[in-house]
Amino acid sequence: MGTINSIIKGAEPIFIKGNEIGLLISHGFMGTPQSVRFIGEQLANLGYTILAPRLSGHGTDYYDLEKCHYDDWFASLENGYQKLKKYCTDIFIIGQSMGGTLSLWLAKKNPEIAGIMLINAALTIPSLEHLQNLSSPRYIDEDHPDIKDQSVYEITYKKAPIHAIHELQKLMDRTPAILKSIKCPILGIKSAIDHVVPPQNTDFILANIESKNKQLIVLENSYHVASMDFDKMTIVNSCHQFVQDLLHQKKQARIE
């Protein structure tokens, strides 16, 4: 899906070349790479190669988002994965909200992925359920991003196209059925209080995914957009530890 409008300043994709361990980071619905910039840069400082693509229709104008199907968002993430494969021997995925949902699909399609880290991954968004079968209004007003730290500004759209909401709902509705086919290690990160995606979404994913290596982190001082909130360094540290533990296990298995 092509973009006809220019990219909002600050919403550009992020690529930082580091070592042979790649971290592909996906923002969520209506968000941009800006929402994951902090965690990406912090992880890059630890040596990783970082790529945070801009999902199709995001970071430009909501008219662009209206033209997208969820396959377009997945294609944006998958293209990022293919790019990272040129530089990296091991690739891990970090996905926030809808980015977490897309990460599950990427892991299903690419079982060689070393592990996934999901931040408030979305399977249900109760506040949007009343729009499921409506064709109007064409756009709805978007609330302020769900961030506890009031000093934070997230780049997003002022309106959400109802067509894009329907595509998001389709993606979420179809995701539970694939969980049994995903076996890579998973770190589920959820905010204790999330006004957009119920924290139980993460519990459901961990309970139903086929992965043997499952871990859970609960953020006590952040809301939905946790990568920009008070616990953002907890996310960085938890993801770093998760990756390092898996790399150590892989190294030990080779020795044995």
Regions found by a protein language model. Give the residues of each.
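Short alpha-helix in the alpha/beta-hydrolase fold that links the catalytic acid
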Residues: 39, 184, 198-207
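Catalytic nucleophile-loop/oxyanion-hole region of alpha/beta-hydrolase
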Residues: 61-87, 92
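Gly/Ala-rich beta-loop-alpha elbow adjacent to hydrolase catalytic centers
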Residues: 95-99, 103
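Active-site nucleophile loop of the alpha/beta-hydrolase fold
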Residues: 117-127
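Short beta-strand/loop motif that positions the catalytic acidic residue
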Residues: 182, 188-190, 194
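Catalytic histidine neighborhood in serine/cysteine hydrolases
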Residues: 203, 207-225
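Catalytic active-site module of serine/aspartate enzymes centered on a nucleophile-bearing elbow/loop
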Residues: 221-256
